[in-house]
Curated annotation (Swiss-Prot):
Pfam families: Toxin_12. Disulfide bonds join C50-C65, C57-C70, C64-C77. Residues 22-48 form a propeptide. Coiled coil: none annotated. It is found in: Secreted. Residues 1-21 form the signal peptide. The modification Leucine amide is found at L81. One of its GO terms (molecular function) is toxin activity. This is Mu-theraphotoxin-Hhn2j 3. Expressed by the venom gland. The keyword Disulfide bond applies. Belongs to the neurotoxin 10 (Hwtx-1) family. 15 (Hntx-3) subfamily. Monomer.
Length: 83
């Protein structure tokens, strides 16, 4: 009984993968499928023109993103609350 349930589940998974593959025309199908299954996005290394929260910075150079400010004490970007 356990083997029958396992085979039925494996068949459904295989049917899902084959159906998804037939609709996909991209060459990066395995990566796309794994990222959808595990909800993991591939890091593409997009560069920003500013530094985000926790990034090291130099006070006075205005390197941090909008709504962030460089901390004089810790030398990293923090959220600017406006005093």
């Amino acid at each position: 009984m356990k083997a029958l349930m396992f085979l039925a589940l494996a068949g459904l998974v295989l049917l899902f993968v084959v159906g998804y593959a037939s609709e996909s025309e991209e060459k990066e199908f395995p990566i796309e499928l794994l990222s959808k299954i595990f909800a993991v996005d591939v890091f593409k290394g997009e560069e920003r023109g500013c530094k985000g929260f926790g990034d090291s910075c130099t006070p006075g150079k205005n390197e941090c993103c909008p709504n962030h400010a460089c901390s004089n004490k810790h030398k990293w970007c923090k959220v600017y609350l406006g005093k």
